[in-house]
Design a protein with these regions (language model features):
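Short hydrophobic alpha-helical segments enriched in small aliphatic residues
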Residues: 31, 60, 67-70
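N-terminal periplasmic/intermembrane-space "pro-region" immediately following the signal or transit peptide
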Residues: 55, 66-68, 72-153, 430-434, ...
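Outer membrane beta-barrel
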Residues: 116-296, 306-310, 317-324, 390-413, ...
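Cationic, low-complexity basic patches in intrinsically disordered or flexible, solvent-exposed regions
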Residues: 13, 42, 53, 61
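Outer-membrane beta-barrel pore domains
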Residues: 155-156, 196-199, 207-210, 321-333, ...
Length: 504
């Protein structure tokens, strides 16, 4: 038996802002009789993605004679990190029984009918969401390296020291997945914190802040849906945006772990300036194609960063119910002027960054994510790549456990490095003299165990607060000592952070 959920029946998007793993939610259910609820099934339109919600409890709020019954449904959602905010949803509650034994009054709506008048279409402005998140943490290294660095880490690179990773402000209006005509959205996101050392667009706020905590622009883009070519249409993103490539993201609310993989740190781009299209060929298949100015680059040539050259981003996405695949590539010249020699045209040599993310949901609690990565730079003849495997398991509505294993090969000692100075990373990217070090030809292995703890019954303004403790072990698997200031083959670290959302 199906009951309509009127809160989700309007065009206004229902947003669930989540840290990877789980999110508590409360929804109202209206029916002519109080239902006995087994499960709640929500379908994200256009992608035909089905998310199953475990129903933890139902409480009848009002049930006067011959009147509608209102039941509040509390549950938990487990989500892929790139599906942090859902748009308008079609929803239904599947019920095995109806508690009332007598027939409902004939004047009351039947369970299959909408029991409330249709909501007026939401205004465009009412679908805008604004939020803040604050992330801070620390990573403890019992070896106490002399240089104070956790080698192989970037965003958690400071050993035995606290970091204010991000104080971020986000304003967004996502595209309406139910739109049948032209629809327009946007996303603006910027932050202040230590993460900005590694996320700058070259030429934007990059060398003006010689300190640990810096300002950075992450997203400044326009979203457009146009109903052309296919029944489901095309989505366009134009401006400055985080890369769609890879499993982990800059925004910490989209990641399960505090620390990042070698793939995220050294094997994929982080941001682009340009545009790309997502063509929804069918509910199963999406095709990606776009042009941008390069890896972490802005408009124009800033420090010989190849921003004036053509760079291609493309690939495909598959959505087959429990199984999803996102396979993307980015191709274009990335080496700064002069880095290959005084008489070498760096614009003639491409870098190829290839990545595939395969997600499988065994059930509502257990999720597997496999990431495959390969990178090649023709200019220096360097290759690298590997695989990362994640498993997460929902233990309770408040606690989710996870494990991540990774093997990543730096064949030529070109990609993996440490950057002790606040400007070393951006100076290396633009060919300037810098204090970075690395050059180890080896295979890196890492395994991380962690937990996400989300306290329940928090005030709405800070609902979603999460603590992420983790223990991580890194090891060079082939004849190198990159850790503990170049003295050790391996490294133990213990990290913890907290992400505090402020919801408006």
């Amino acid at each position: 038996m199906t009951y309509s959920i009127n809160h989700l029946s309007s065009r206004k998007p229902y947003s669930i802002n989540s840290v990877f793993g789980q999110t508590n939610f409360t929804l109202p259910l209206y029916a002519s009789t109080p239902p006995s609820i087994d499960r709640l099934q929500l379908t994200l339109l256009r992608t035909s993605l089905v998310l199953k919600f475990e129903i933890l409890s139902g409480h009848k709020l009002a049930s006067p004679q011959n009147a509608r019954h209102v039941t509040t449904i509390n549950g938990t959602i487990s989500m892929h990190p790139r599906l942090i905010t859902l748009g308008a949803l079609a929803a239904s509650v599947v019920s095995s029984a109806v508690a009332a034994q007598t027939a409902p009054d004939s004047s009351a709506p039947t369970p299959t009918e909408s029991s409330a008048p249709p909501a007026a279409p939401a205004s465009w402005a009412s679908t805008i969401t604004n939020s803040i998140h604050i992330e801070g943490g620390a990573t403890f290294n019992p070896a106490g390296p002399d240089d104070g660095l956790n080698f192989g880490h970037l965003f958690t690179d400071k050993s035995n020291d606290g970091l204010l990773n991000q104080v971020a402000i986000t304003s967004t209006r996502p595209l309406d997945p139910k739109a049948t005509g032209v629809d327009i959205g946007y996303k603006l996101q910027g932050f202040y914190g230590s993460d900005a050392r590694y996320t700058h667009f070259i030429g934007e706020l990059d060398r003006d802040q010689d300190r640990r905590n810096q300002f950075d622009v992450v997203e400044a883009n326009v979203l457009i849906h146009v109903p052309i070519l296919t029944k489901l249409g095309i989505d366009i993103k134009a401006g400055q945006y985080s890369t769609p490539i890879g499993n982990e993201v800059i925004d910490p609310t989209g990641n399960f772990f505090y620390s990042h993989t070698y793939i995220f740190n050294f094997g994929i781009p982080l941001k682009h300036t340009g545009f790309y299209t997502t063509t929804h060929v069918s509910p199963v298949l999406d095709i990606y194609a776009g042009y941008d100015t390069g890896v972490n680059t802005s408009v124009g040539s800033k420090g010989g960063d190849n921003a004036g050259e053509f760079h291609f981003l493309g690939g495909f996405g598959l959505n087959m119910g429990k199984l999803t695949v996102l396979a993307l590539t980015h191709i274009g010249p990335e080496n700064p002027d002069g880095s290959l020699g005084p008489h070498v045209n760096v614009h003639s040599y491409n870098r190829y960054e290839n990545d595939a993310v395969i997600t499988y949901k065994f059930n509502d609690k257990l999720t597997s994510i496999t990431e495959l990565n390969y990178i090649r730079d023709d200019g220096v003849g360097a290759t690298g790549g590997g695989v990362a495997q994640y498993f997460t398991y929902v233990l309770t509505p408040e606690v989710t456990a996870g494990v991540r294993g990774e093997v990543w090969r730096d064949n030529n000692g070109f990609y993996v490095a440490a950057f002790p100075g606040n400007l070393d990373y951006i100076d290396a990217a633009t060919g300037r003299l810098n204090g970075s070090f690395g050059g180890y030809v080896t295979t890196y292995g890492a395994i991380t165990l962690g937990v996400n703890f989300k306290p329940a019954k928090l005030p709405k303004m800070i609902d979603g607060l999460v603590f992420r403790p983790e223990v991580r072990y890194d090891r060079a698997l082939a004849g190198a000592n990159p850790f503990d200031s170049g003295h050790s083959v391996d490294q133990f670290t213990f990290g913890i952070d907290a992400i505090l959302p402020i919801n408006f």
